[in-house]
Amino acid sequence: MLTAIVGVNWGDEGKGRMVDLLSERCDIVVRYQGGNNAGHTVVNDKGKFILNLMPSGILRDGTVNVLGPGMVIDLEHLCGEAERLRQGGISVTPETLKISDKATICMPYHKLLDCLEEDRLAGKKFGRSEEHTSELQSQFHLV
């Protein structure tokens, strides 16, 4: 069986919570697009976990999790998130987390360009997060 959770409200509609609830019955959980500008908190018997890049299935033993081709991955953030999960007793290994070779990697200069754009706007922000991946995401048509 295939279950898809698709947001149509530009975020903040509870997709992460639904994935957490439904992932109990899944062998594979795929996050197909986005970056660490999104996030949700999961509280379970292992503790409280804040997820930005990781699919919610990472909290389930025996579940394979995939960061898909539409993902924008900030490696520094991903490594930090993985380490926090490991400290909480969650297994983050090559067996539990797969990364598409078509995912986009956020480089330090992308963040710098995003900060420079904010400066150019002279404080007139237009709703982006402080993760500084907007510049990179604007360069690609992610599908």
Predicted regions: what they are:
Residues M1-E131:
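Non-transmembrane, aqueous-exposed alpha-helical and coiled segments at domain scale
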Residues E131-V143:
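Single conserved hydrophobic/aromatic residue that forms the stacking wall/gate
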